[in-house]
């Protein structure tokens, strides 16, 4: 299932985005299907998903040495996609690489433009009892596949919200600038904590501080009622309780919010309602079967748009960006030109 799960792919690029790393690299399309069953279309589909997840540098791991005298198909790498001259698709491989080069010329420029920091509540995983001697945290492990974080990540993605994951340690390095939550690499509109039962004292204290300085911090399916850890000082336990008791929530539709200094803490069982409360807009193109990733550049914004549906799309597509002009570039052919566009209630509609 390599390259087929967007949520799993986004874990590593999230770190690159929040930490200000220019490249997020992936060993890509190593094992898509059985030997000689994968084609370049399968590879492109996998690469597009990596690009949507924030990967902007790739390498292949299927080109191994094979002596000239070795009988066909030559020496093979044990994984199933073979990028070497004995594969019938070798002559066309260059066209895929031209496509990749063109896409990455944009995705390696500028900075990420995501709105939501999705907190990975590792303390809940650590608190689970079980007979497994070693925990794994790869994208396809049950710690991700069965987590409340994944539930929120899928909901955010399906509804067109742009997000990155963030850990406790990374969250402690954030600060507030103009009501935006700023990491070393990017700025975000909100932090989403998803159905966490336990949370480190320092993390909760930081979330409260961010709200106090003007941020909107949102909690999906409740706020943690207990601190993480085995040895907790009475002073910290008392302060943790004081922080929670000080929250005076008032219902506003499907959301309950409490003012904290210049900002607010909000709770709801509806992620869309929480995003609306945090003034986070969605990319409505997802409703048409398109997916995208945005980046900020010196001259505006880049969109990498992928048609994930099984139909051809020729229609007006809304962008969650107000623009004076728009250009289209087809990375497969290299053809570019100005796009037909119109403004619609603060957003830009582009004809694709």
Feature map (PLM): residue ranges:
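Carbohydrate-binding surfaces of carbohydrate-active enzymes
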Residues: 1-352
